[in-house]
């Protein structure tokens, strides 16, 4: 009887210790908030890379993004589904940290190194990394290696900007593809549909980025309506006649809508 009691006591102690270890290490909620490691890449005052895995191209350095962008580790990039999402980041792990929050948009992928070894990792642009620092201490923060931050998912807000559709350089009437840029709110999309002139809405395929495409068996003619469904809240908006009948590859077309 005594040995049985000791066995159950040890079992209970083991279960408690397991629970304690789990709680100590559980510092993330990928969909919401937690702590993460942060590094930076590219030029000290730059936008990380010109373009990146999400397909935004040179737009990352220009308004309304202003180079306040980041590559996401696997959990945040999420096979491209994280493109366009926004995160508030507060630096906590270095004396040069200002403690003031910044907001960045995920525009690129960081697949290796510390990005892959941590549950959540944020690889900031040089400009965004400097924005985490106290005045005059940006270089100290950039030279610190991996620092710790608090992060949380934030609503994207591009004031005075509506959604833009930038046609892919290889797009044609049989293969229509474009990047969707500057979505307010969730920042990501769960569904994109295109409606050609005189036709019905056709679901498009996300290309592990902010690029969406449709391969049609026949030529699609514009003008095109585009119906967008946001990723988290599933709000739906329609950009009517946003891509004209005489559209051209590598051109951008600005809508009059946003979430």
From Swiss-Prot:
Q: Where are the annotated glycans?
A: 25
Q: Which InterPro entries match?
A: Expan_Lol_pI (IPR007118), Expansin/allergen_DPBB_dom (IPR007112), Expansin_CBD (IPR007117), Expansin_CBD_sf (IPR036749), LolPI (IPR005795), RlpA-like_DPBB (IPR009009), RlpA-like_sf (IPR036908)
Q: What is its main location?
A: secreted
Give the Expansin-like EG45 domain ranges.
51-161
One GO BP on record is: plant-type cell wall loosening
Describe the location of the Expansin-like CBD domain by residue ranges. Answer: 174-255
Q: Tell me which GO cellular component terms the UniProt record holds.
A: extracellular region; membrane
**Location of this chain's protein in the cell:** Secreted, Cell wall; Membrane
Looking up Pfam families in the UniProt record yields: DPBB_1, Expansin_C
Question: Any signal peptide, and if so, which residues?
Answer: 1-23
Identify the keywords attached in UniProt to this record, alphabetized: Cell wall, Cell wall biogenesis/degradation, Disulfide bond, Glycoprotein, Membrane, Secreted, Signal
Membrane topology field: Peripheral membrane protein
Disulphide-bonded residues: 54-83, 86-156, 91-97
Family (UniProt): Belongs to the expansin family. Expansin B subfamily.
Query: What does the UniProt function comment say about this protein?
Result: May cause loosening and extension of plant cell walls by disrupting non-covalent bonding between cellulose microfibrils and matrix glucans. No enzymatic activity has been found.
Q: Report the protein name in the record.
A: Expansin-B4
Gene source species: Arabidopsis thaliana (Mouse-ear cress)
Identify the coding gene.
EXPB4
């Amino acid at each position: 009887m005594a040995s049985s009691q000791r066995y159950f006591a040890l079992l209970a102690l083991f279960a408690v210790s397991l629970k304690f270890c789990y709680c100590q290490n559980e510092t993330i909620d990928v969909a919401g908030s937690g702590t993460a490691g942060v590094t930076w890449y590219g030029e000290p005052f730059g936008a990380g890379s010109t373009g990146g895995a999400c397909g935004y191209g040179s737009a990352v350095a220009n308004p309304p993004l202003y180079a306040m962008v980041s590559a996401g580790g696997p959990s945040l990039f999420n096979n491209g589904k994280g493109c366009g999402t926004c995160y508030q980041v507060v630096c906590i792990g270095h004396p040069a940290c200002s403690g003031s929050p910044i907001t960045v948009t995920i525009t690129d992928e960081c697949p290796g190194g510390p990005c892959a070894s941590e549950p959540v990792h944020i690889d900031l642009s040089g400009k965004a990394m400097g924005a985490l620092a106290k005045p005059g201490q940006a270089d100290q923060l950039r030279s610190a290696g991996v620092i710790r931050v608090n992060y949380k998912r934030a609503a994207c807000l591009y004031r005075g900007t509506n959604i833009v559709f930038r046609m892919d350089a290889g797009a044609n009437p049989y293969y229509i593809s474009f990047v969707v840029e500057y979505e307010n709110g969730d920042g990501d999309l769960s569904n994109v549909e295109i409606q050609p002139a005189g036709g019905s809405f056709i679901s498009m395929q996300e290309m592990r980025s902010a690029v969406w495409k449709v391969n049609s068996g026949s030529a699609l003619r514009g003008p095109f309506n585009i119906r967008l469904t946001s990723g988290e809240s599933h709000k739906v908006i329609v950009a009517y006649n946003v891509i004209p009948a005489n559209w051209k590859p590598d051109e951008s077309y600005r809508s009059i809508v946003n979430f």
